[in-house]
């Protein structure tokens, strides 16, 4: 039996499977292990201002949620933001969908925005402003949110061998997940079915295969035969 090591970095929650064979995700590693240099700012800063051209950045702030519903409004989202409140997923925002109602008890909470730069604009009027990340105003219930902690997440530069894993328990926030599947159960080309996985990155046997996102048309990743040997 040839067991293959699968590593995921998941920014959005999802269900895990590999075609007809169930994936066994048994371990996790928190993203704190790949934090870059933290920047503190009263206002949101684009990724370029914290030294990130591509990839992911975590924006965090302490907020006070009023009684009743409170709408989170972001002026610019480039390109995708997974919104968490005290580690609980609230929803996702894009530059076409920049308002989200938060669900929480009144009081102090930690707002976490995991943001990915999906790519650069190469045509049209927005080419003059190719900033990525979050920038401009951020409001909760009409009130400006200040006091941001901005942290680069060095996901794609990670050497999987350097991560420290522990047994997988309840893990609601983005993290690395590691598991195995049986190569002997598949003949011919092997594809990883990523439909329903949310958003993240994939490594097999230490080899980086690429990213996935459930809003893209392609929902499978070909696993090269040479890394399954």
Indicate residue ranges for each PLM-predicted region.
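Sec-dependent N-terminal signal peptides
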Residues: 4-13
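Carbohydrate-binding surfaces of carbohydrate-active enzymes
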Residues: 19-128, 160-163
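Short strand-edge motifs at loop-to-beta-strand transitions and within beta-strands
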Residues: 59-61, 98-100, 177-179, 217-221
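Aromatic-lined ligand-binding clefts that engage carbohydrates, nucleic acids, or primary amines
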Residues: 69-84, 111, 181-205, 212-213
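Short, isolated positions in well-ordered beta-strands
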Residues: 90-91, 145, 209-210
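Short, surface-exposed tryptophan/glycine-enriched loops
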Residues: 100-108, 182-183, 220-229
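Compositionally biased low-complexity segments at domain edges in trafficked proteins
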Residues: 141-182
